Every structure is written in C-alpha cells, then in structure tokens.
Amino acid sequence: MEIKQIMVAGAGQMGSGIAQTAADAGFYVRMYDVNPEAAEAGLKRLKKQLARDAEKGKRTETEVKSVINRISISQTLEEAEHADIVIEAIAENMAAKTEMFKTLDRICPPHTILASNTSSLPITEIAAVTNRPQRVIGMHFMNPVPVMKLVEVIRGLATSEETALDVMALAEKMGKTAVEVNDFPGFVSNRVLLPMINEAIYCVYEGVAKPEAIDEVMKLGMNHPMGPLALADFIGLDTCLSIMEVLHSGLGDSKYRPCPLLRKYVKAGWLGKKSGRGFYDYEEKTS
C-alpha cells in the first residue's frame, strides 16, 4: 500500500517532530491533540525549528513555507478517517493509548495502519484492543525526531508482513533508518539506555559523585555526546521513570528497579528541562 495521508495523534515534542519530519519528506500531515492549545504549541514549536534551520542556511524560506503548508491541525480525531496511517504519540500510558486505539479503530477505514510511537509498551497488548491487530505496529522514533536517524519498528504477534513492509518503507521515505526489533519491554533502545541512566542516578543517590562529574566521566571516558543525567533531563524524568517501571514489571528482574531518587524527583515535580529543574537547574538559563 502506498501511504500518502498521515495523521499524527499527539502534538508534544515527539508528535510535532514526527509531523515536521513527515511534511519535510513531502507528505501531507494532519496533527491532532486532545488539547487544542497543545496542538497550536506543537505547530509553533516546529515552525520555530524550521525558522532556525533557515537562519543557519540549512534550508531556504521557500522550503520552510512548503513544509509548513503541508501540515494542518485537526480539530477532532474524526479526521483520522482520511489517513492511510495514524502515528500515535501521546503520553507513555497504556490506558490512554489503548483508549485512543479503540477510538481510531472505530473511526479509520480498514486499510489504515495504526502505529504507536511508544518507547517501551507492548505492541501486542495495544493491538489486542482493536479489530485490526494485523494493521497495528510500533514505530518508535528517537528524540529529537528531525535529527535522529533511527526508527525502531516493532511487530505485534498479529502484525502482517505487508504492514511491516509499508511502515519500513515509510520510515525510509522520511529519511530514517528502520531497524526491526521484537516486541519485548523497552525494545532495544530503552532496554539498554534506561538502565544506564538509572545506574547513573544511583551513583548520585549513593553519593558516588555529583551529576556534573558523572556526566563528564561518560562524555570524556566513553565518548558519549551527552552525559546520562543531562540526557535524562532532556528525555524527562517522568518518562524515564515510566520506562523503568515497564522494564521492571515486564521483565521482573531487580536490575530494572527504578532508583528511589528518580521517584523522589518526579514526585517533587523535578522532571528535567521541561519543568526547569531536574539533575540540573534550567531556570537560570532561561531567565
């Protein structure tokens, strides 16, 4: 099946990034969010990113306008009836995702592929709430979407070969490298990355070193472009906690137990860069 019309459901950092990347590849994209203000904020965010690219000479003003003209905001989820694929990019919450997939299954025509940008939740379980499990698949983009080249493609137990091939082809058209992985908690990326971040948090919790020192060790000693604690702040500490909880409950191994300090920060509202404070203080930088 040739995919022409795309809807992105969820206009946060990931959703707006996916919409921008798809439009940049020549697709017409509808972007929806249950909160209309969030949809407008998502559009504003991607416009700002495109303008920044133009200032740096990475694209012309004409190209920027062309990309923006291929993105429209949907006022209702009902507009998904026009889509060949819906890429869900809402909060990492199973109840919210399954509810959305039930709704999309009712709205969308039979040929529409329902893809989830989940970073850790089981695709098979999400697909099971629909009447089209063969058309449900995981399409896990990396953050920031316009920059990062990887897309993890995850088949559920019932995902058809045709659906997988269509999504792999779509990812390639969007300028990404599609890597197929199996449907296990955290897939590959977060099963490897998040325990490392969690261990770095334990190093803070146990007084091994300060966040700056830990990040410096990993950058200079392991050639990481960003330290694990700065990366955790960038991802969002609430998201990190959610993924660690999925790994811990899904795999049952104590090595995936979330650090108590991570829980404490999330309960305090210290979520990282988006809240102004996490392992680093971002409020001073923005004031």
From Swiss-Prot:
Expression induction or repression: Subject to catabolite repression.
Enzyme nomenclature, EC number: 1.1.1.157
InterPro entries to which the protein is assigned, alphabetical: 3-OHacyl-CoA_DH (IPR022694), 3-OHacyl-CoA_DH_CS (IPR006180), 3-OHacyl-CoA_DH_NAD-bd (IPR006176), 3HC_DH_C (IPR006108), 6-PGluconate_DH-like_C_sf (IPR008927), 6PGD_dom2 (IPR013328), NAD(P)-bd_dom_sf (IPR036291)
Main EC class the enzyme belongs to: oxidoreductase
Keyword field: Fatty acid metabolism, Lipid metabolism, NADP, Oxidoreductase, Sporulation
GO biological process, any: butyrate metabolic process
Disulfide bridge partners, by residue number: none
GO molecular function: 3-hydroxybutyryl-CoA dehydrogenase activity; NAD+ binding; oxidoreductase activity
SUPFAM superfamilies: 6-phosphogluconate dehydrogenase C-terminal domain-like (SSF48179), NAD(P)-binding Rossmann-fold domains (SSF51735)
Pathway note: Lipid metabolism; butanoate metabolism
Record's catalysed reaction(s): (3S)-3-hydroxybutanoyl-CoA + NADP(+) = acetoacetyl-CoA + NADPH + H(+)
Residue(s) at site: Important for catalytic activity: 140
A Pfam family reported for this protein in Swiss-Prot or TrEMBL: 3HCDH
Family classification: Belongs to the 3-hydroxyacyl-CoA dehydrogenase family.
Name of this chain's protein: Probable 3-hydroxybutyryl-CoA dehydrogenase
Native source organism of the sequence: Bacillus subtilis (strain 168)
